[in-house]
Regions:
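A glycine- and small-aliphatic-rich helix-loop capping segment at beta-alpha/alpha-beta transitions
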Residues: 75-84, 154-159, 284-285
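ATP-dependent carboxylate activation and anion-phosphoryl transfer catalytic cores
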Residues: 4, 107-109, 225-312
Length: 312
């Protein structure tokens, strides 16, 4: 579709700004290769004005975390009547809220680690309850890219982690630690892509392991049997549908030594950087990076605008 004008939204004010810019820059290069007119813009105070000036045919949402994955930008774009890539308002808001997502998974009988939620806004930081066995995985209630995720193995580490977390987030989850191999499965459209095994250089798939060169190895297709492949793909599709996600998503798993898969994280807007998992999985399925970007753009165009009460 020569002449198609695509606005790529990247950056934003959150902790995942740099990763978002990496994703958006990669998408911009792909759009140029495809012959589309790519226009980049930041999600800042001039966003609506800049979007009106660009007047794009479609928006490619390359934001991550708060503002980009929580329904905020989705609401703005629907208000303006501009088609955009990825999931809608409600699905994004639910998927970024780890507590709400886990409640839905548990209600549907889908495997997720046991967890507790702690409020850090009361002035008195919570002590480690005696009922919680260590280690625990502490993470912000609403964040992506493994930002702020820490494995707590001692009471001393708990106190330090809580103090640091209170400076960044109002609530945390403390999840049961599950040992095992890490896997990920993306959904594109209504199809589960090949499984990738993640072999992090650190003790888990941390922010650095995700985005720093050499931080992890991606084995795709994962060296697992057909039965486990099928179970992980089925789980990824179940999670995608349960949360009402669309276009694409990525679900991360841990598989215990007994072979039991557990859902760790759901990503409504998977990263599109050079070290991201989704492009690796798509390539194994026969889609180049450019073809993946093209597919996502055309999903949005085919869907069109949602409510559209204001013209850009």
């Amino acid at each position: 579709m020569p002449g198609l004008k695509v606005a790529v939204v990247m950056g934003g004010p959150g902790a995942e700004r740099e990763v978002s810019i990496e994703s958006g820059t990669s998408v911009m290069r792909a759009l140029a290769t495809l012959g589309y007119e790519g226009r980049s813009l930041d999600f800042d105070g001039r966003f609506i004005e800049a979007l009106r000036e660009i007047s794009p045919d479609v928006v490619f949402n390359a934001l991550h975390g708060v503002g980009g994955e929580d329904g905020t930008i989705q609401g703005v774009l629907e208000w303006m009547g501009i088609p955009y890539t990825g999931s809608g308002i409600a699905a994004c808001a639910v998927a970024l809220d780890k507590h709400l997502t886990k409640k839905l998974l548990a209600a549907e009988g889908l495997p997720t680690p046991a967890w507790d939620v702690f409020d850090l806004t009361g002035g008195t930081l919570p002590l480690l309850p005696g009922s919680l066995n260590l280690p625990r995985v502490v993470k912000p209630r609403a964040s992506g890219s493994s930002a702020g995720v820490v494995i707590v193995r001692s009471h001393e580490a708990w106190s330090k982690t809580i103090l640091e977390a209170a400076e960044r987030t109002p609530e945390i989850l403390a999840e049961e630690f599950v040992a095992g191999r890490e896997f990920s499965c993306a959904v594109l459209g209504e199809e589960a892509l090949p499984i990738v095994e993640i072999v992090p250089s650190d003790e888990f798939y941390s922010y650095d392991a995700k985005y720093k060169p050499g931080g992890s190895r991606h084995l795709v297709p994962a060296p697992i049997d057909h039965d486990l492949t099928s179970r992980l793909q089925t789980l990824a599709l179940s999670v995608h549908r349960l949360l009402g996600l669309r276009d694409y998503s990525r679900t991360d798993f841990i598989v215990s030594k007994e072979g039991r898969p557990t859902v760790l994280e759901i990503n409504a807007l998977p990263g599109m950087t050079a070290t991201s998992l989704l492009p690796d999985e798509a390539l194994q399925a026969g889609l180049s990076y450019e073809a993946l970007v093209d597919r996502l753009v055309h999903y949005a165009l085919a869907r069109g605008t949602e409510t559209g009460v204001l013209s850009p």
